[in-house]
Amino acid sequence: MARKKLMRFKWNDEVHNLFQPEKDNYKFYKGNWKEYFKNTNPIVLEVGCGRAEYTTGLAALNPDVNYIGLDIKGARLWKGSSLSIETGLSNTAFIRTKLQNLEEFFLPGEVNGIWITFPDPKPRESEAKLRLSGLRFMNIYRRLMPQGGKVFFKTDNKVLFDHTLEVLTNPDLKITNLVYTHDLYQSELLSEHYGIQTTYEKTYLKQGVLINYLKFEFLPL
C-alpha cells in the first residue's frame, strides 16, 4: 500500500472529527450530536461527500450550522477531515459508512438538511435501490426530517436527474417548493452555491457538460 495512503489511514484512526467502524465511539452520538458539537445548531448532511467540498465550504460560510459529511471511502474523508482541522472548522464531522445505514447515526428530527452532490448514477436497473436520489433514499431522508427539511441535489447526469424528478412526484414523500434547472451555470440558482465546486464538477465544466440542480423541502408530517 502506498505510503501516502497509509499516512491518511493513520490520520483517520487518530483524529476526533472522523467516525469509522474501528472506533469505540462510531455510533455514540446518535441522538446526541449536540454533545459532539457543543451546541444545538441545525445539522446538515452531505451524503456521498467524496472530498467534502460542500461540507467544508458551507461550514466555513455558516458557523452557526453543523455539517456532517458521509462516505464509504476513508481516503476521501481524509480530505475533509484534515482541511477542517487545518482551517479550524469546529462545525464539521465525518462518518465512514454505507449510506443505507444513515439511520444508525441519526434519530428522526435530528437532521435539518441534506446535500447530494454528484452521486454515482448507478445506471443499471439492478442498482436502482442504491441511487442516492432514488425513492429508497428519499424515504430515509424523509424519516430523518419529519419536522420538514431541505434537500439539495446536483448532478451532471441528466438521466439520473430526470429520474429524480419523477421520484419526487410520489405523493407519500410530501414535498413542496421544488425548484430545478438543467443548466445551473445559466441559472439564478447559482448564487446559492457561493462558488463551491466539487472536483467532479470542475472536470465536467471543463468538458462543457451542463450541471443539473434541484432543491425542495419536505413538509412537516
Which residue stretches match the model-derived regions?
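S-adenosyl-L-methionine
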Residues: 1-43, 53-60, 81-108
